[in-house]
Amino acid sequence: MGRFIFVSFGLLVVFLSLSGTAADCSSGWSSYEGHCYKVFKQSKTWTDAESFCTKQVNGGHLVSIESSGEADFVGQLIAQKIKSAKIHVWIGLRAQNKEKQCSIEWSDGSSISYENWIEEESKKCLGVHIETGFHKWENFYCEQQDPFVCEA
């Protein structure tokens, strides 16, 4: 009996330690490096997509891509979910006019520690493009309606 309790306790400890290794994501969301991600196929403007993400889950925003590993993960996630002819998908990067200076920042306020531009253009909102496997960033008109990726 004592051996059974010891083995059961050991299995419980292993289970609890493994369950804490990934983010606890809601159903339909995917986990990477402690964050949760979900691709939404419906088309929205950049502003509407950002607003939608904030309402999905506490702390939600359009995705902020902070490393090449995260870019690979997000690109693969989009490629798995978007099977239509849509060629752009919104990410959380947007040019903001502040005190007569234009700055680029993530919608969640995090700093830009990783960059992966396709080319420089004058449009204000950014997304990823199918021709680059959804890896490279490109400027698009903010009022354009496209699918998007939320992160929490």
Swiss-Prot record:
| GO cellular component, as recorded | extracellular region
- Disulphide bridges: C25-C36, C53-C150, C125-C142
Record-listed Ca(2+) binding positions: S64, E66, E70, E151
Q: Name one Pfam family in it.
A: Lectin_C
Q: Which residues form the signal peptide?
A: 1-23
Organism superkingdom: Eukaryota
**Annotated compartments:** Secreted
Question: Main role?
Answer: Anticoagulant protein which binds to the gamma-carboxyglutamic acid-domain regions of factors IX (F9) and factor X (F10) in the presence of calcium with a 1 to 1 stoichiometry. Also inhibits platelet aggregation by binding to platelet glycoprotein Ibalpha (GP1BA) and functioning as a blocker of von Willebrand factor (VWF). Is devoid of hemorrhagic and lethal activities. Possesses antithrombotic and thrombolytic activities. Also hydrolyzes the Aalpha-chain of fibrinogen (FGA). Does not affect the Bbeta-chain (FGB) and the gamma chain (FGG).
The similarity annotation says: Belongs to the snaclec family.
**Record protein name field:** Snaclec agkisacutacin subunit A
